[in-house]
Curated annotation (Swiss-Prot):
Catalytic activity: D-erythro-1-(imidazol-4-yl)glycerol 3-phosphate = 3-(imidazol-4-yl)-2-oxopropyl phosphate + H2O
Family indicated by similarity: Belongs to the imidazoleglycerol-phosphate dehydratase family.
Name under which the protein is recorded: Imidazoleglycerol-phosphate dehydratase
Gene3D superfamilies per UniProt: Imidazole glycerol phosphate dehydratase, domain 1
Amino acid sequence: MRVAQVVRNTSETQISVKIDLDGTGRQKLATGVPFLDHMLDQIARHGLVDLDIEANGDTHIDDHHTVEDVGITLGQAVAKAVGDRKGIRRYGHSYVPLDEALSRVVIDFSGRPGLEFHVPFTRARIGTFDVDLSIEFFRGFVNHAGVTLHIDNLRGVNAHHQLETVFKAFGRALRMAVELDERAAGQIPSTKGSL
């Protein structure tokens, strides 16, 4: 079973993430940031991973620490659940549309953290959610999952649609990358022999 639980406590946030990479998309989310919960739901449902995430943070100041630290903790949990990366497909990609919006996400479980985030948001906030926090979420994720991640919103007018297509495509790309390839069972997907 490829499951993991990570608890991260700082003076700013207390976060618990449980993940099952071979799940069905079941989720239980309570981050204190409703729009973040909505986006995490997209990862679970479209990635077919089971996610239980609880967070208590200093949201009385703003949502920055909570969103970033959920990304960090989710990245740690994914890295732990994937383990030595033997037998995974390693690469994943997805294009997802939502009405006028279209996003592409490509992920590589390379062991080298890197983020290319290109989303020309049409407004600064979605409700009360600061769209800049999405960058902090994904930066935290890549740095702690050890992945290279390219995120491109190719078109969109509605900022909610833009970001929702990003999270849906991320879930689908994640699913593809961590999927076990029976033809490569027990093998590291790299000519170097390690990731």
